[in-house]
Amino acid sequence: MLETWRWFGPDDPVSLEQIRQAGATGVVSSLSHIPTGEVWPLVDIEAHKQLIESAGLVWSVVESVPLHNDIKTRSGHYRQLISNYQKTLINLGAAGIHTVCYNFMPVVDWTRTNLEYVLPDNSQALRFDIVDFAVYDIFVLQRSGATDSYDKAVVEGARARFEGLDQPAVAALENNIIAGLPGGEGSYDRAGILAAINHFNQFDNEAYRQNLIAFLRDIMPAAEIADINMVIHPDDPPFSLFGLPRVLSTAEDVRKLVAAVPSASNGLTLCAGSFGARGDNNLVAMAKEFGDRIHFVHLRNIKRESDGSFYESAHLEGDNDIVGLIAALLAVEAKDTSGQRAIAMRPDHGHTLTSEQADPRLKPGYSYGGRMKGLAELRGVIHALTALGTGERS
C-alpha cells in the first residue's frame, strides 16, 4: 500500500518536511484557493505538484475537486460547471495525477458535534453525538419537521439537554456543525444553512442518486481520456442529517452506483470510519467485493453507540476490523498480475495529543502527532501481514 498524508497546502501547520519524516511518500492535497466550480489551470496544478516534489514527495491523490451545489441539484449553471469540471480533470491528467476523491453529500460535508472529546488518556478525539445534533436541528435551527427525523428517546433527550445549555454552549455546538471542517465545502450561518436545506429537500434518496449518476455519466468521458479514477467518498456519517438524502452509505449504494456507471474510472474511496459508523457495513466484505474499484483508502476506527452516536477511537482500537481490512486490501493488490498495484492509504484523522492541544492553527482531526502515531501503527500491521504472506487472515 502507498502511505500518504493529507496536506492542506502552504498554510498547513504540518510541513511537507514533517510529512516526509513521518514516513509517508505520497501527498493528498487540493487547490483549495480556487473557488468551487472554476477550472483548475494547468499552471496552478503544476506549481502545486512541483512544491510537493521539491520536498521529496509525490502528489498521489487529489482530495478533492469539490462539486458546486448546482451540479448536485442539476440546476442553475450546472452545465457550465460540469464543463469546467471536465477541463479540470483533463488538466490533472496532463499533470500526471490520476486519482481524484470527491463526495456528493448535500449541504454539510463530514460532520461532528464535539471536536475536543476528551479520552481517558487526556488526548482529544472527534465525536458525533446524535442527541447533540438533534438539539441543534430541533431547538436551535428549528428546522420544520425536524422532530420527525429522530426517535422519541432522542427527541426527549435533546429537549432535556437543550434546557441545560447556555448561549456559549449553543454557539460552540453551532460552530462545530455548520462552520465547516477541514476539507469540507465552505461554511454557513443559520439562515444560510436553512436556505440550503430547503433547496435540497426536494430530493429523496433515489432522486438524488439519479443526480449523482447523471453527473458521473457527464464526466466519465473526460475521466477516461485523462486516465483518472474518480473515487467517491461515502457519506459521513452514513445516515441522513437534517432530513436530507444519502446516496453512498452502504454496500448496496455502491452496487447501485457501479451498475449504473460501469466505467472503470468510476471508483471508490473506502473510508473505514465513514462506512464503519454503521454496524451493518462489513468493511472486510466490502474490500473483497469492490476491490477493483478501490483506489484510495481512509483507515480510521470508531466506537459506535446504540443510538447512532460514535467517536473516533485509536486506529487499531474500536469496532472496525482494521487488521482484517488491511489484509483484504493487500490481497486485492496481490491479485494484480503486474505486481505494480499499490492502493493509496492515509491515516484518516488522529487524536490531538497534549503537545498540540493549545495550537490555534490545529485543524480538527488533523494533528501531526496523532496521525503519525496512527500511520506507524498501520505500517506495522502492513509489514506484519506482508511478512506472513499477503491475503486474508484465516
Where are each of the predicted segments found?
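Glycine-rich, histidine-containing beta strand-loop boundary motifs that form or position
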Residues: 31, 61-63, 101-106, 234
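Histidine-acidic metal/acid-base catalytic patches
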Residues: 2, 9, 17-20, 53, ...
